[in-house]
Amino acid sequence: MIRQFVSHRGIPCYRLAVRRVELTEPFHHPSPWPLGRKNWSTSDEAKSKRAAMRKGGAPPPEHEDWELTVGIEIHAQLDTDAKLFSSASAALDDVPNSNIALFDIALPGSQPLFQPSTLIPAIRAAIALNCDVQRVSRFDRKHYFYQDQPAGYQITQYYEPYAKNGSIWLGAHDGIAKEDGEGVQIGIKQIQMEQDTAKSQELPSSTYLLDFNRVSRPLIEIITLPQIHSATTAAACVRKIQAILQSVGAVTTGMEMGGLRADVNVSVRKRSEAAGDHQYDGVAGLGQRTEIKNLSSFKAVEYAIIAERDRQIAVLKAGGTIQGETRGWTLGSTETRKLRGKEGEVDYRYMPDPDLGPVIIGDDVISDLRRNIPGLPDELLQMLVQDPKYGLSTVDAKTLIELDDGQRLEYYQDAVEILTTLQPDLSADFSAGKVVGNWVLHELGGLLTKSSAHWDSQRVPAQSLAEIINLLSRKNITSSSAKSLLAMAFDGDKRSISQIVEDKNLLFQSLSRHEYLALAEEVMRQNPKMVSEIREKAQLGKMGWLVGQIKRIGDPNRVEAQKAEEILRELILK
């Protein structure tokens, strides 16, 4: 039975008394964390296919009589310091083969030792995905031989997983296909815990290096029901599940950092004909499915499904039959490729693990975790859009939620809090949330993109960003000075914002009307044709260019664009 004992990053943790457990594994190797490689074809046909993929997953007119059905299996690394079945550290960035126990490398006589703390993020994931957490679950062995699995089997939960019967709702804001309307609900068959494999690195001359630090690192596998009928919606489903897992602290990283990958099961059938002969996970009337493994980005999920959909339809139109098999897809490819024939369940030789007892989870544990579950993405989205404190657009709110494993959102909220305390006297019309959102996403985001840097909340601390925005909103500095301050802080200037402003003499000193008139008249004298076009042809859009010229010949830290334009309008349009 699990009992509460300490807190895990602020959330209660529990101790489990294990009596007995079981496991199972696969007989092929789906190499869970592959290195993507490009496989570009330069033929006109391939270029045309890639262009069609980029337009989205909607089927072309000639495919409208065909129904696509997709089920997804998502493998995610749990956010835990412990391995699943050994006392070794789960850290991945240490020296290769430095975090291993005897069981991790399957030394004879070693046995698995279940680590109860790994259950906490797993249960949080199940609750967030609306699953029924099972009071009793068991581990099984899934047998296969591959170099990165020294035991010859993987420990998983095939027969009695710890969570079942979940669901996820995808709305239009999640980026689903237009044909799915305002929203679609996807069922989740089960979530099971399983151990990761070693990390392999291929070298020339058929040489492989193996790092066993990753062996027995805890994973969860989330299996959806085959209820998705669009490649676009399938990608949106993976994206939404990743966001949910990150929001509750269940996983380490997302697809972009290699902490999550997906396999997809794809089948097609002709709508005008009788229902298909196949049934998967209780969903009947489907066509023969194929499985595409090891997809490591949202676009890979979408493009691989499109490629396999088109391949299957072409085969069936030509009078052929679809073989149940495992296929692969590589970055840049327009076609899937056969990896192997699909093995039957018997080939994995699933069997209960005799070295592990059942996992028994008490109702009090589930209730406590449910009570303390952090905000889910849809709840966060609603708050960021509807709360006057933030007032973001749906697009900006979704972007903040999805960026950098939630770290950008936390940074944004910190900056809003700080800015609000700095501005108790400002007008109610000033929206701290909107202004900070623009700076975090666009100004700071632009610097990150330009430098190809990864997100680091300490590169420009939230306090510094709030101080810059505060100075700008009070018109103590100009917009160009604010951007310069941000760039200096981003590039490593460790001085306080106030010190930089003082050292660089950036405090705004407004120009007099006489100074504005002199600058405007000089710019008009240098650009008579532009002035004539504005005056005679009412080409007011060119006024901004003249404002830029005033900034160029004047002091950019003293010129206010609005006042400069007012003077120009007065002189040109009088």
UniProtKB/Swiss-Prot annotation:
An individual GO BP term: mitochondrial translation
EC number: 6.3.5.-
Reaction(s) catalysed (UniProt annotation): L-glutamyl-tRNA(Gln) + L-glutamine + ATP + H2O = L-glutaminyl-tRNA(Gln) + L-glutamate + ADP + phosphate + H(+)
Domain of life (superkingdom): Eukaryota
Cellular localization per UniProt: Mitochondrion
Gene Ontology CC terms, in alphabetical order: glutamyl-tRNA(Gln) amidotransferase complex; mitochondrion
Keyword Nucleotide-binding set for record: yes
Signal sequence residues: none
Entries under Pfam families matching the protein: GatB_N, GatB_Yqey
Coiled-coil residues: none
SUPFAM superfamilies membership: GatB/YqeY motif, Glutamine synthetase/guanido kinase
Region (Disordered): 34-62
Transit peptide: first to last position: 1-12
Keywords from the UniProt entry: ATP-binding, Ligase, Mitochondrion, Nucleotide-binding, Protein biosynthesis, Transit peptide
Example GO molecular function: glutaminyl-tRNA synthase (glutamine-hydrolyzing) activity
Known partners and oligomeric status: Subunit of the heterotrimeric GatCAB amidotransferase (AdT) complex, composed of A, B and C subunits.
Cross-referenced PANTHER family: GLUTAMYL-TRNA GLN AMIDOTRANSFERASE SUBUNIT B MITOCHONDRIAL AND PROKARYOTIC PET112-RELATED (PTHR11659), GLUTAMYL-TRNA(GLN) AMIDOTRANSFERASE SUBUNIT B, MITOCHONDRIAL (PTHR11659:SF0)
Record-stated family: Belongs to the GatB/GatE family. GatB subfamily.
HAMAP family: GatB
Described function: Allows the formation of correctly charged Gln-tRNA(Gln) through the transamidation of misacylated Glu-tRNA(Gln) in the mitochondria. The reaction takes place in the presence of glutamine and ATP through an activated gamma-phospho-Glu-tRNA(Gln).
Protein's UniProt name: Glutamyl-tRNA(Gln) amidotransferase subunit B, mitochondrial
Source organism: Ajellomyces capsulatus (strain H143)
